[in-house]
Curated annotation (Swiss-Prot):
Pathway: Isoprenoid biosynthesis; isopentenyl diphosphate biosynthesis via DXP pathway; isopentenyl diphosphate from 1-deoxy-D-xylulose 5-phosphate: step 4/6. The record marks H36, T135 as: Transition state stabilizer. Belongs to the IspF family. It catalyses: 4-CDP-2-C-methyl-D-erythritol 2-phosphate = 2-C-methyl-D-erythritol 2,4-cyclic diphosphate + CMP. 4-CDP-2-C-methyl-D-erythritol 2-phosphate binds at residues 8-10, 36-37, 58-60, 63-67, 102-108, 134-137, 141, 144. This is 2-C-methyl-D-erythritol 2,4-cyclodiphosphate synthase. GO terms for biological process: isopentenyl diphosphate biosynthetic process, methylerythritol 4-phosphate pathway; terpenoid biosynthetic process. A divalent metal cation binds at D8, H10, H44. NCBIfam families: ispF. Its EC number is 4.6.1.12. It comes from Yersinia pestis.
């Protein structure tokens, strides 16, 4: 068994700055997150947690923001590629727990589809995926509505033992 932790944060752009994508879901909101890729903090944190658990570095090492190939990249594709490397190393997902930290917009209506997307991308059952959201009670940059943060914890199991 191996445990990994991931964290990501992106700040909001101006009104009309693009789509807000979290957990692979387009969420109606007046602002998008600024990023080299699509800015999906949930998938970035999950990808970092997976890579960390397998000692494969981090999302910035695998998909550097200095590489134009990843400009505007779909984070679901990045997650799938990272997971392909996890499988090649002899591990599979045990479970994934994600916490989205945002004052707005409300995430609860979108969490079921986020779980579906993650289970599909990680080739697992939805019972292996948990996504929850919280606020910081209007404290800090997320509380002021300046951006969104996300943490993820993952358990990998050896394919031969799992």
């Amino acid at each position: 068994m191996r445990i990994g932790h991931g964290f990501d944060v992106h700040k909001f752009g101006e009104n009309g700055s693009g789509p807000l994508i979290i957990g692979g879901v387009r969420i109606p909101y007046e602002k998008g997150l600024l990023a080299h890729s699509d800015g999906d903090v949930a998938l970035h944190a999950a990808t970092d947690a997976l890579l960390g658990a397998a000692a494969l570095g981090d999302i910035g090492k695998l998909f550097p923001d200095t590489d134009p190939a990843f400009k505007g990249a779909d984070s679901r594709g990045l997650l799938r590629e990272a997971y392909r490397r996890i499988l090649a190393k002899g591990y599979k997902l045990g479970n994934l727990d994600i916490t989205i930290i945002a004052q707005a917009p409300k995430m609860a209506p979108h969490i079921p589809q986020m779980r579906v997307n993650l289970a599909e991308d990680l080739q697992c059952h939805m019972d292996d995926i948990n996504v929850k959201a919280t606020t910081t009670e209007q404290l800090g940059f997320t509380g002021r509505g300046e951006g969104i943060a996300c943490e993820a914890v993952v358990l990998l199991v050896n394919v031969e033992q799992g």
